[in-house]
Amino acid sequence: MTPRLVAIDRPGGPEFVDDVLRIWDAGDAVFPVDQRLPAEAKSAQLRTMRVGEAVEEGDALVMATSGSTGTPKGVVLTHDAVTASAEATSARLGVTHEDHWLACLPLSHVGGLSVVTRALHTHTRLTVLPGFETTAVDESGATLVSLVATTLRRIHPERFRTIVLGGGRPPADRPPNTVTTYGMTETGSGVVYDGVPLDGVEIDVAADGEIRLRGPMLLRCYRDGSSPVDADGWLATGDLGRWLDDGRLHVDGRRGDMIVT
C-alpha cells in the first residue's frame, strides 16, 4: 500500500504521541497541524502540504516552516534523518534512561516535535503538554526541556538538569544549565550546540559569510519536490556567521527565508 501523509490535528498530550506511533506503524508520514491557526488557515495548510497524498517510503515527518518571510514550505524528514538527529542530540546532552523529557513548545514546529521524537528513539520518559504553562512546566519533574527565551524567563531553571534553548539570540544572563542551539526546520532541529556542531554535522562558512551545513539529519526535500541541498549535500542556510577564536560558530544574522528554530 502506498504510504501517505496523515495529519494530526489535536493538542499535545499522550494521545498525540499515540497518533504518531500509529501512523508510523502503518508506514505513513506525520504532519502536525498548528493548533493556533483558525479553521480556514488550517484547511489551507492541509492543502498546501498535500495531506492524504502519497509520500516516499521512509518518510517520517512533514513539518511546515513558519513562513515569516515567505510562503510556508513543507519540509520532508525521513526516519533516518529523525533518528540521526535524536541520536546526535542525545549523545551531546548525555541523555540516559533516568532522564525525563518535557515537550511544551508547539508540536507543529520542529523545535517542539523533536523533543517527542528524541524521547521515542531513545526510550526516554516523556511528558507532552498541550502548551506552555509555567506551573505545569515547573512541576513536571522533567530533567530535560526545550524552550525559547521568552519561556525561559517564566520558569525556575534550576529544576532541570539541562535546558535546550532555541528560537533566536539567547539572553545575556542565561542560566548555566542552558545549551544554546542553532538549526532550522530543514535540519530537523538544532545541529549546533553552544557553537559546536553535533557529531556527524559539518559546517562551512563561505567567503560571503553564509553558513552551510551538511549531515545525515537534513531534509530529503520540500513537499513540492524541490530541494535546497546541493549535489554535494550542502544546505545553504541563508544565515551569516563566523568562526570565533575558540573554534565555535557565531551566528551574526539572517538572510533568506529559512527559519531558525
Each PLM stretch: what is its role?
Residues 23, 65-68, 101, 119, ...:
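Conserved S/T- and glycine-rich ATP-binding loop of Class I adenylate-forming
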Residues 1-37, 103-106:
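Conserved AMP-binding/adenylate-forming
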